[in-house]
A protein has these predicted regions:
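ABC-type ATPase nucleotide-binding domains, specifically the catalytic core motifs of the NBD
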Residues: 36, 76, 118-137, 145-147, ...
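The feature captures the beta-strand-to-loop junction immediately N-terminal to the Walker
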Residues: 57-59
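Helix-to-loop junction immediately C-terminal to a conserved catalytic motif
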Residues: 72
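Conserved ABC transporter NBD signature motif
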Residues: 80-88, 99-101, 134-139, 144, ...
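ABC ATPase C-loop
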Residues: 173-174
Length: 258
């Protein structure tokens, strides 16, 4: 009820736009989406610029993961649109979103195959490449970037630490060289020291590689400290939108989510 009380006046499109640095790269407009016939998101809108990061926070069941699922094509879209770099991608399949629009989805914990080697897990990220040699070349670029994976490339992924497994999950998405990373609960199930490592990796991907990152994170304090933009979702709608550091200072957000 308290969360609903702060959602009385949803931010205007102009307010969402004001948080974007430069041109809008990915936009959602008046999206109604859900699962089966159940609508979870109601006239939902979002704006983010290229190379920016956005963190979605809110109570359980607010629709945070549904936003990521809708962008990637895992939900039923009843109305509204999703655009990337001016291209309408609303009705593309997940594989088309990855190969044509450069959108990669990084799953929650436990998507690594423990019996397969680190390299085999990584190569699975390139399954949409036209030629196996292209996936191999992209995987080598990942190994050059992350020595802790390169050192274990021929070992079963099951021997990796929790933080290294999360690094492998992120790296597998990089094989398709995406522009947009959808990251679902990067800190889930990790010890604090590995959480810091994962956020450092994501920060590097944004700052140095120019990736656009949209994240759902239950650790709201960590997510908002990382992100340029923060949205608070309540009942399938954005209740508050502001710069990440401003939301950290917002007393309502602090009382309810931090």
């Amino acid at each position: 009820k308290e969360a609903a009380s702060i959602a009385a006046s949803a931010p205007l499109e102009s307010e969402l736009r004001a948080l974007v640095d430069g041109d809008v790269f990915l936009s959602i407009d008046n999206l109604c989406a859900g699962y089966g016939k159940m609508e979870i998101l109601h006239d939902y809108s979002l704006r983010i610029g290229q190379g920016q990061s956005l963190c979605l926070i809110g109570p359980n069941g607010a629709g945070k993961s549904t936003v990521l699922h809708s962008i990637f094509g895992f939900t039923n879209i009843f109305s509204g649109s999703i655009k990337v770099d001016g291209k309408d991608v609303t009705r593309l399949t997940p594989s088309q979103k990855l190969s044509e629009a450069g959108i990669a989805y990084i799953l929650q914990d436990k998507s690594v195959f423990p019996q397969m080697t680190v390299e085999e897990n990584l190569l699975m990220g390139g399954f949409l490449k036209d030629k196996p040699v292209e996936a191999k070349a992209a995987a080598e670029m990942v190994f050059e970037k992350y020595s802790r994976l390169a050192d274990r490339r021929n070992k079963p992924a099951g021997v990796l630490s929790g933080g290294e497994r999360r690094l492998l999950e992120i790296s597998r998405a990089l094989v398709m060289q995406p522009k947009v990373l959808l990251v679902d609960e990067p800190s889930i199930g990790l010890e604090p020291r590995f959480i810091d490592m994962v956020f450092e990796i994501l920060d590097d991907l944004q700052r140095k590689d120019g990736k656009t990152i949209i994240m759902v994170e239950q650790n709201a304090k960590k997510g908002l400290a990382f992100a340029d933009i923060g949205y608070v979702l309540v009942s399938g709608e954005t209740a508050i939108a502001d710069a990440g550091d401003k939301l950290l200072e917002n007393p309502d957000v602090g009382r309810l989510f931090l």
